[in-house]
Every structure is written in structure tokens, then in C-alpha cells.
Amino acid sequence: MNLLDVIELNARYGDALDRFDLAAWKALFTANAAYRAQARENFDRGLPLAAIYLDGHGMMADRIMTIEKTLVFAPRFTRHIIGLPTLVDESTARTPFLVVQTVTTTLPEILATGCYHDTLAVTPDGVRLASRNAVYDNALIPNSLVYPL
């Protein structure tokens, strides 16, 4: 695995979420991967509390179904601006991110800034996320956190 592999993974990740292709988003994780969206305060203190915690493809599929079939919320668009990753070692990386949200009737607003803390795995399909903790810097999230960061 090299830096370009991680950049490509992150590009596909942001693109999938910005297109609301949650099946493509889920495919970027290993089958037993964990995904969290967690406030920096909790992360820094080693607290497990997270706004979103998904453990494995099963929980990810449940979240996708909930978003697509049952949740009622104002139509919105997101744009993920993902920085260059820092490879911590051969299987972990940190990558800064910015997510801008536009609700169709309002001006765009910053939804979250932060850092992805990733454990990576090389699979036959390429580099995949074995875990991603999206640690957001802001203590407050505008409205609600519906989609993954």
C-alpha cells in the first residue's frame, strides 16, 4: 500500500457520499469494519461515545436502509473536501477533512471539520477501510448528523 492508494480510497469515499451512493460507500470498508463519527472532545479523552457507530457491513446496511427508506429530513447535498493523508505506519493513516452541507433552501454551511483516523487493509479489491473514526472538531453539528462524514 502506498500514499496514492490511500488518496484514491479517500477520493472514492468522498465521491460516493457526495453522490449519495451509500452502497459504494459501504463497499470501501472490509466486511467487519467499524465506522464512527465522534466529537474530538470524546476522542481526546478516550471516551467511546460517538454520534454514529457502525460495526460491520450489517450495521452499515441498516443505516443505509434507514436513510433511504424511513428518515424524513430536508433535502440536502454534501461536498467532502478531503486533504492529503499522513501514513502513520503501514496500516494506519490520518487525513484532514471538511464537509460542507447545503440544504436546498439555505446557503451552504460547514457541517464538520476534522480528521479521519483510519486502519487500512489490502484486499483483493484494493485498499479498504478496516476502521474509520471521523473525528470532528466542532462540538455542535448543524441540525443533525444524518449521513456519514
Q: Where are the predicted features?
A:
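Short, low-complexity N-terminal intrinsically disordered segments enriched in polar/charged residues
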Residues: 1-31
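Short helix-to-loop capping/linker segments positioned immediately adjacent to catalytic or ligand/cofactor-binding
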Residues: 13-14, 70-76, 104-106
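A beta-strand edge to alpha-helix "cap/lid" segment located at domain peripheries
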Residues: 77-81, 86-149
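A generic "alpha-helical surface" signal
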Residues: 4-7, 16, 51, 58, ...
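A general boundary/transition motif marking the beginning of the first structured unit of a protein
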Residues: 1, 13, 48-52, 108
